[in-house]
Amino acid sequence: MASPRTRKVLKEVRAQDENNVCFECGAFNPQWVSVTYGIWICLECSGRHRGLGVHLSFVRSVTMDKWKDIELEKMKAGGNAKFREFLETQDDYEPSWSLQDKYSSRAAALFRDKVATLAEGKEWSLESSPAQNWTPPQPKTLQFTAHRASGQPQSAAASGDKAFEDWLNDDLGSYQGAQENRYVGFGNTVPPQKREDDFLNNAMSSLYSGWSSFTTGASKFASAAKEGATKFGSQASQKASELGHSLNENVLKPAQEKVKEGRIFDDVSSGVSQLASKVQGVGSKGWRDVTTFFSGKAEDSSDRPLEGHSYQNSSGDNSQNSNIDQSFWETFGSAEPPKAKSPSSDSWTCADASTGRRSSDSWDVWGSGSASNNKNSNSDGWESWEGASGEGRAKATKKAAPSTADEGWDNQNW
């Protein structure tokens, strides 16, 4: 990249000596120059000048290349108008020259020497110039075979053009080198030649690189593991110290104080007694549950449903219940309020389980006219029926009035 100073100098030079147009084709605003002659050329003509070789024309870009001070001095010493006027003053100059002939001529060699001498700050004269003895390079001639397939020889012009092309190709090869060395001198370095052992070297370098990466990763892993172990150890020790402190404060110190005060045995005995009472309660409850399950009875008598009224009731346990209501028929037509009585059966005959006595119902006193109060009588209904007119009636007169406890059909108020 051209520096600001370089661009300033080139801008001043462009405004002089017809440098605002291409020296070869006359195109406006040229961006390339031939430093050897100090002339300005366009992009297309710069490619043609590169083909001549650096010994005939050294091409530089106005904006993209770096410039040296000697190159800027050559641009000041040369110029489009100066080079054209110098060529026209030479005896061997011909306007019909080709590009190669023009820059290979003695006149172009003299102007090159003049520009280089003036750029160095020296005086130049035509007589003392070493370019006076300049001989243009001879093109390489083709070696023709003695026997040609065709009888007609090639023309001199065709052979001359072929020789020029061969010479140009050789010159380009010497300047640019091989394909990979084309841009040498433009900031590119020449790559080293490949050898047969490059494959082995590349493999070994890859192996070394992989091993170095592995060692680096292993060292990082080891350092991370060390840090983790250190951190875990510190946390574990901290937790252990906290646990020991808590155990000392909550267990050991209270136990020591109780031992000193003599309360440790009281606490132990109270705890054992509480445990024994809980075990006893749980055991008794479990035994009641087991016995209740196998006996099929309820745990509490209050949980059993009340027995209802029926025509027959022979249960001995019901004789102790004195709060059972009398039925409707037992109090029907009675002027006296109902009284408590011992349980009796509504069946034909019922043995009193509590007293061992038997109470008679309506069949026992059928036809007797009055109820019998002999509770120890073992006669049934048919026996009373037979003695109704005889002994039964006489016995009935001797007995006291029937008790008001006889209800139902035995009541005389019915």
Curated annotation (Swiss-Prot):
InterPro entries xref list: ARFGAP/RecO, ArfGAP_dom, ArfGAP_dom_sf
The UniProt record lists the keyword Transcription regulation: no
Subcellular locations according to the entry: Cytoplasm; Golgi apparatus
Location of Phosphothreonine modifications: 135, 189, 349
GO molecular function: GTPase activator activity; zinc ion binding
Extent of Low complexity compositional bias: 310-327, 334-347, 362-388
GO biological process, one term: vesicle-mediated transport
Pfam families: ArfGap
Keywords: Acetylation, Cytoplasm, ER-Golgi transport, Golgi apparatus, GTPase activation, Metal-binding, Phosphoprotein, Protein transport, Transport, Zinc, Zinc-finger
A GO cellular-component term linked to this record: Golgi apparatus
ZnF region ranges: C4-type: 22-45
Domain Arf-GAP: 7-124
Residues found modified as N6-acetyllysine: 231
Biased composition, class Basic and acidic residues, residue ranges: 297-307
Top-level taxon: Eukaryota
Record region (Disordered): 296-414
Modified residues (Phosphoserine): 150, 246, 342, 345, 347, 360, 362, 379
Gene3D superfamilies noted in UniProt: Arf GTPase activating protein
Domain notes per entry: The region downstream of Arf-GAP domain is essential to GAP activity in vivo. This region may be required for its targeting to Golgi membranes.
Subunit structure: Interacts with ARF1. Interacts with the COPI coat proteins, KDELR1 and TMED2. It is probably a component of the COPI coat protein complex. The interaction with TMED2 inhibits the GAP activity.
Task performed by this protein: GTPase-activating protein (GAP) for the ADP ribosylation factor 1 (ARF1). Involved in membrane trafficking and /or vesicle transport. Promotes hydrolysis of the ARF1-bound GTP and thus, is required for the dissociation of coat proteins from Golgi-derived membranes and vesicles, a prerequisite for vesicle's fusion with target compartment. Probably regulates ARF1-mediated transport via its interaction with the KDELR proteins and TMED2. Overexpression induces the redistribution of the entire Golgi complex to the endoplasmic reticulum, as when ARF1 is deactivated.
Name of protein: ADP-ribosylation factor GTPase-activating protein 1
Native species: Mus musculus
